Amino acid sequence: MVTMTSVTLGDVRVVRSVDVQSYVGLKPSTARKSVSLLRRTETRPLMVVRASKEGDISVKSSGLSIEESEAAAVAGNFPDPPPPWRPSAPKGTPNVKPLPLTRRPRRNRKSPTLRDAFQETNLSASNLVLPLFIHEGEEDVPIGAMPGCYRLGWRHGLLEEVYKARDVGVNSIVLFPKIPDALKSQAGDEAFNDNGLVPRAIRLLKDKYPDIVIYTDVALDPYSSDGHDGIVREDGVIMNDETVHQLCKQAVSQARAGADVVSPSDMMDGRVSAIRAALDAEGFQEVSIMSYTAKYASSFYGPFREALDSNPRFGDKKTYQMNPANYREALVETEADEVEGADILLVKPAMPYLDVVRLLRDNSALPIAAYQVSGEYSMIKAGGALKMVDEEKVMMESLLCIRRAGADIILTYFARQAASVLCGMKSK
């Protein structure tokens, strides 16, 4: 039992006495308190606590009786407080004087609550865009180089995948078509067929989910028999202006079907201004352009090209995509895209080019996107499958790092899996 008594050195008078239940946290303790409330007359009251053990309460004895303790308290003779408790260090730890530091940054990291309070970068499902591969068939076909990804049947499989993504908060997707070889040509005319695979998929999705945000890829490589992003001249040169003409028709066709954001990934010069003019001329002023501003000629695209069977039939893409060694060149592309009317600037790939993401973030007021490409995805998946890394932790860290570098949105094949983690669900 715990008795609390208020004592003064002058005349005192008991006002009332009550029993109260003591609480520890949210659970009632086994100890009870008897409280005497007294009115002070001339001198400051002192509080003396007398404790006895009813439950598992540890009280260190002072060697004095209760009466002696109360008398000592009335006389002002309080014992020295015990030294603060400190956890013991491991055996062999040297005994050193504390460093004379005025600033110890670890103080702000010492508890989960403090770490959460001071976190500078956050990630949510609204920051994620899910790339989806579609094809003309009805069956979902697994992509060997990208575990967990499929070429989705453009009707049932696509709708089911979008439903699952929306269920965890991902409401933005980007479509990439696998075009049959029979429909490919050197000029890529299938790219602007209003009844083609992509326009049909857009209309289907908008009919089922009117509020979904659909990004589309504007480039000729899925439709080209040569596998390049533009029309190839007989000497192997990619024809810039003629390709831009085709891209404008492709963007208008996608907008007509209901695309919210058209995304030229071709890296032709002047294509953003031409596409903007073409969209406006057809009454699609509200359709946004996400320009692949800094798209590098990267080796990280391999699994993607397998998924779409869009590898170049000859040569490479170094005459139009950027050199991985270049940094300042991204500023040239940024300035051009801003002047030409881009609404969003994208860097691709993401993780190996975080310095470029930060460069664009620091030099443009436009939203910045980053594409965590197929090679990045597959490396994390492979490391997780081999138990070399914790797949989920590496996935979340990689996305957070892309956000920290300055990306407002991230195109990632992890979108649904990451969103499931963010909302506390296991990805299905």
Protein language model features and the residues they cover:
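Glycine-aromatic-enriched surface loops/turns that form tight recognition elements
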Residues: 106-109, 118
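N-terminal chloroplast transit peptides
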Residues: 1-39, 51
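Low-complexity, intrinsically disordered short peptide segments enriched in small/polar/basic residues
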Residues: 11-12, 17, 21, 32, ...
